[in-house]
Each structure stands twice: as structure tokens, then as C-alpha cells.
Amino acid sequence: MLIIETLPLLRQQIRRLRMEGKRVALVPTMGNLHDGHMKLVDEAKARADVVVVSIFVNPMQFDRPEDLARYPRTLQEDCEKLNKRKVDLVFAPSVKEIYPNGTETHTYVDVPGLSTMLEGASRPGHFRGVSTIVSKLFNLVQPDIACFGEKDFQQLALIRKMVADMGFDIEIVGVPIMRAKDGLALSSRNGYLTAEQCQIAPGLYKVLSSIADKLQAGERDLDEIIAIAGQELNEKGFRADDIQIRDADTLLEVSETSKRAVILVAAWLGDARLIDNKIVELA
């Protein structure tokens, strides 16, 4: 497994792979890898000849400096996991390598609408940072496919739109959420939880599933469903942050013509902001 930290060396390897006619898959990550990331890697391996995993804690997508400072950097452990998975290439650049003149004056990519709605409304600049680094990685790696987790539902929708709008010839693969046996979605943020909070955390998925059951049963008073769900989260020990029920295909409000709904839930548990989602077919 090659570990590359600089742009010139990465370009050299990508040119070689292209000359050999290899089909390349990219799995962009910020490191602190868990089994959910490994599921992305496995999907990439099944679809391509060569798998490139990027590990880069992107400062442009953090709206709070304290979150950037405390994000775990576990490069050695991450590379050991990826080597066992027989990943071909790890791209682990420094911030200076990606943003040589800092982030303030760096050219950015913005996806109108999707960048500022829902999750983007409470995290200004976050999705602009995501779309900028992902587009840069696409230009550098030139993958045939790229794999992203469906847990970050809005992020996946944003990347799909960016790829369509910018004409990237890349297949975007959404990989289903990987969950623990108790239903908790695997996430790097789970590492912030105390032992006691780990016992509470699965309650998020229980509330999410309760909302889904109501929608499938034909309930359509969305305001009431959301209000009850928020109350249930707070009673379980969370601080409900945002609960949305949207059209799964547009992320706009559910209408009479909506065929699928996506339930988006965000809640604080201690210092960890947990997110989850579930898609429901509407009768």
C-alpha cells in the first residue's frame, strides 16, 4: 500500500494508473476510521481495480474552531486498517499541501440551495468546505467512481448535484448506513461519548424508527410528529437539535406528489452532535 502526502507524487501515480487503463475508485475520509468507512472501502474494491482513500481533516468545513482542534488524528491506526483491507493508495496530505496560502483566499465551490438549507443553515460554510475539498480531490485523483456514506444524506445529495452541474465524469455511489446491533449509526463522533452516553445513544434510532412507523401508517401531521419526536429525544437524555421530514429526492418539503420521504434527525448527547436518517416510502 502506497502512502502519499504530496500533490506531485499523487499526480505521478494517477498518471501511471491511467496509462495502465485501471478503473479507479476514491473514498474520501477525514480519518479516525471505523467499520462504516471499511464498508465504503469494500464497496469501492468491488467496483474498481484500484482503491484510493484520502485522509484529510479539512479545516474549511468546520464552522467551529474547537471542533477542528479536537477532531481525532489517527493516521497510523487508519493506515494499518486500510493496509489489512488491501487498499492500494492512501493520500494523506497536510493542510499546507492542500491550502498553501490558507483557506481564506482559496477558490471555493458552492452548491446553491443545498449548501445553506437544513444542516447548512445551522453550520454556515460547512457544505461549501465539503464541496470545495471533494471537487479538489476529484480533480487530483480523477476517479471513475467515488463512494460516500448515506448517513450524511444532505452531503451525498450535494455531491451528486455538484457532479451533475460541473460535468464530472464520475459515478457517485451511496453506501447504506452501517449500524451497531442496537441500531446506532457508526460515526467518528461516537468516540466523544462517555460509557453512560453510549447506553443512551441508540435511543436516537428508536425515535427515528418511531417517526418512520407513523409515516408508514399514514399519519401526515408532520408538525405534530416532529414535536413528539423532539420531546421523546429530550426525555431520553438528548438535546434535540433539528428534526426534518423532507422529500427524499429533492430535500424540499413533503408534498402530495412526494413518493419518498427522508427523516433527518440531529441531536446533542453531551458534547457530541449525532445525526441519522431514514427513508420511508409514502403510500
From Swiss-Prot:
Residues at which ATP binds: 30-37, 149-152, 186-189
Gene3D superfamilies tied to this protein: HUPs, Pantoate-beta-alanine ligase, C-terminal domain
Enzyme class label: ligase
SUPFAM superfamilies from the UniProt entry: Nucleotidylyl transferase
Any matching Pfam family: Pantoate_ligase
Biological-process GO terms, alphabetical: pantothenate biosynthetic process
Main location: cytoplasm
Residues binding (R)-pantoate: 61, 155
Annotated catalysed reactions: (R)-pantoate + beta-alanine + ATP = (R)-pantothenate + AMP + diphosphate + H(+)
Residues bound to beta-alanine: 61
InterPro entries given in the database record: Cyt_trans-like, Pantoate_ligase, Pantoate_ligase_C, Rossmann-like_a/b/a_fold
Note: The reaction proceeds by a bi uni uni bi ping pong mechanism.
Subunit structure: Homodimer.
Protein's recorded name: Pantothenate synthetase
Organism listed in the record: Shigella dysenteriae serotype 1 (strain Sd197)
Gene: panC
